[in-house]
């Protein structure tokens, strides 16, 4: 039995789809926070179980008879590590044999990316638990780029704060498929830590040029101070803590924390990952 947390989210849901595609008879539990949130999974051949990272007993109950756990990192801010720690403790108590965890590329306690420390602590907790593990250190999602770029097509410019440092972007569907590959052959990924990236990194200047070629409109990249980026995010109606988080992502990009390419994703998929150029064509050639 496999338990997928965050099952109604993009990454968890796509991982379920890939697992079922690989083996329609696979037994999957899908962890959701409420019956309401589980409704969109009703048409999938999975067992829906309700639980919450902060409700320890619900986690232990959800993990009954589970051999492998995909712990999709929480998107909740503030107590992310506490949530993960609960899940790891519950997994150990329930007798889970293997935890697959979705971390961040090159997880580093000194990262500019403010949530990196939560990932570092979670990785440490998993290793200290004695449960077998696989750490999937995912690079930045290409899927987030359109919202990062904003109205660049209309304004003619991408205003961001990543300097001209290159960033490796990978698509979420490739990451989900890699999760399914690992979970389906778990014995061969015991106690491994993988850096999950696409094949090539690009700067935001490169991205502006790519979008220009795709759309036929001249787009330039304008590097703005991080404080200006934060102000723009807040003006767009997002809360201050979200602005701080998004600014920290830009800061981490600027110092090269996402300028890394690794062959692991290609090896897991048995094909080249989707390149950023291909992804952008799918978004901006419509």
Regions found by a protein language model. Give the residues of each.
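Glycine/proline-rich active-site loop of Rossmann-fold NAD(P)-dependent oxidoreductases
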Residues: 144-150, 182-193, 259, 286
């Amino acid at each position: 039995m496999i338990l997928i947390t965050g099952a109604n989210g993009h990454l968890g849901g796509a991982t379920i789809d890939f697992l079922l595609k690989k083996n329609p008879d696979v037994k999957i539990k899908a962890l959701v926070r409420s019956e309401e949130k589980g409704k969109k999974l009703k048409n999938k051949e999975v067992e829906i179980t309700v639980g919450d990272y902060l409700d320890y007993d619900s986690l232990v109950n959800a993990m009954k008879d589970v051999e492998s756990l995909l712990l999709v990192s929480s998107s909740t801010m503030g107590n992310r590590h506490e949530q993960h720690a609960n899940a790891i403790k519950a997994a150990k108590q329930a007798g889970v044999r293997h935890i697959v965890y979705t971390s961040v590329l090159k997880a580093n306690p000194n990262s500019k990316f403010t949530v990196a420390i939560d990932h570092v602590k979670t990785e440490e907790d998993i290793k200290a638990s004695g449960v077998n593990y696989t750490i999937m250190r995912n690079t930045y999602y290409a899927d987030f780029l359109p919202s990062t770029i904003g109205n660049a097509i209309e304004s003619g410019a991408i205003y961001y704060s990543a300097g001209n440092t290159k960033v490796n972007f990978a698509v979420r569907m490739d990451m989900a498929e890699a999760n399914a590959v690992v979970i389906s052959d778990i014995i061969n990924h015991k106690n491994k830590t993988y850096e999950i990236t696409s094949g090539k990194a690009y700067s935001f200047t490169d991205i502006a040029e790519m979008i220009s070629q795709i759309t036929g409109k001249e787009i330039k990249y304008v590097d703005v101070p991080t404080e200006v980026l934060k102000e723009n995010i807040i003006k767009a109606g997002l809360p201050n803590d979200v602005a701080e988080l998004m600014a920290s992502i830009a800061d981490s990009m600027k110092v090269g924390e996402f300028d890394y390419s690794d062959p692991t994703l290609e090896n897991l998929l048995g094909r080249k990952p989707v390149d950023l150029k291909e992804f952008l064509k799918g978004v901006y050639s419509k």
